[in-house]
Amino acid sequence: MEIFPAIDLKEGRCVRLYQGEFSKETVMNEDPVAQAIIFEKFGAKRLHIVDLDGAVAGESLNLSVIERICKAVRIPVQVGGGIRSLVAVEKLFSVGVDKVILGTAALYDKTFLEEAVLLYKEKIIVGIDAKNGFVATRGWLDVSEISYIDLAKQMEKIGVQTIVFTDISKDGTLAGPNIEQLELLQKSVAIRLIASGGVASIQDVKKLNDMNIYGVIIGKALYEKTIDLEEVVEVTKLC
C-alpha cells in the first residue's frame, strides 16, 4: 500500500481544514517546503498536495510553492486543486509534478478530461469528493446531484486508472475512514483507489490495506502525531 502524506496549501502555507470548511483552518507549518522535506526525511515515498486556493479560484494559485517543493524533494509529488485546462496540467508537469488530480473538471468538462487521459494516461488521477454520497466540487463549496458511484463508473469508462476518494464529513476529524463507502466503491469499479479522510491510526491503515486499497492519504494524523510516519511506512512494507 502506498502512503501519501498530505500538504494542503492556502495562501502559501501548509494548513488543515475540518470537514472541508475554509473557516475552520489550522496552520500546520508556515513553510510547506520544509514540511515536504520533513515527510521525505521520515520515510515518505510520495507526497499528496492540494492547492486549496486554486480549488476555489479554478486556477493554480500556489504554483511557485509547488515548484519549490518538487525541487526540494526527490520523491514523486501528486497535485490537485483548480486544474481545469490542459495548459494548467502541462504547467504542473513542467515544474516537476509527477501526477495531476482532476476534480471539478472531471464532472463538468468531460472533453478536457478525455484529452488529458489520452495524452497522459496513468499520470491523470481523478479526485472524487463526496458529501452525503454526492459529489462536491469547487473546493467542496458546491454539491452536485451525481452520486460518487455514478461518477466513478463514468471515470472507468473514460479510462481513468486511479481515483482519490474523500468523504468530506471525515476530513480532518480523525474519526476513521468511511469503510462502507469505500467498500461500495470497490464493488462498483475496478480502478485503483486512494482513500482520504478520517485516517487516525495504524489500525485504520491496516484495515484499508486488508481491503486491498491501493493507497491512503494521511494528513491531520501525521501533524497531530496519532500516526508515526516511519512506523506506518514500515508496517505497510510488511503487509
Curated annotation (Swiss-Prot):
Enzyme class, first EC level, given as a word: isomerase
Gene Ontology molecular function: 1-(5-phosphoribosyl)-5-[(5-phosphoribosylamino)methylideneamino]imidazole-4-carboxamide isomerase activity
Keywords of the record, alphabetical order, are:
Amino-acid biosynthesis, Cytoplasm, Histidine biosynthesis, Isomerase
Which family does the entry's similarity section mention?
Belongs to the HisA/HisF family.
Which CDD domains does UniProt cross-reference here? HisA (cd04732)
Q: Look up the record and report any one GO term of the cellular component aspect.
A: cytoplasm
- PANTHER family referenced in this protein's UniProt entry, alphabetically: 1-(5-PHOSPHORIBOSYL)-5-[(5-PHOSPHORIBOSYLAMINO)METHYLIDENEAMINO] IMIDAZOLE-4-CARBOXAMIDE ISOMERASE
Which Enzyme Commission number(s) are on file for it? 5.3.1.16
Q: Which InterPro entries match?
A: Aldolase_TIM, His_biosynth, HisA_bact_arch, Isoase_HisA-like, Isoase_HisA-like_bact, RibuloseP-bd_barrel
Q: Which Pfam families does the annotation name?
A: His_biosynth
Q: Which transformation does this protein catalyse, written as a reaction?
A: 1-(5-phospho-beta-D-ribosyl)-5-[(5-phospho-beta-D-ribosylamino)methylideneamino]imidazole-4-carboxamide = 5-[(5-phospho-1-deoxy-D-ribulos-1-ylimino)methylamino]-1-(5-phospho-beta-D-ribosyl)imidazole-4-carboxamide
The protein, known as: 1-(5-phosphoribosyl)-5-[(5-phosphoribosylamino)methylideneamino] imidazole-4-carboxamide isomerase
State the pathway, as annotated in the record.
Amino-acid biosynthesis; L-histidine biosynthesis; L-histidine from 5-phospho-alpha-D-ribose 1-diphosphate: step 4/9
- Say if the entry is tagged with keyword Amino-acid biosynthesis: yes
Q: Give the active-site positions.
A: 8, 129
What does the UniProt entry say about where the protein is found? Cytoplasm
> GO BP, one example?
L-tryptophan biosynthetic process
Upper taxonomic lineage: Bacteria, Bacillati, Bacillota, Bacilli, Bacillales
Primary location class: cytoplasm
**Annotated Gene3D superfamilies:** Aldolase class I
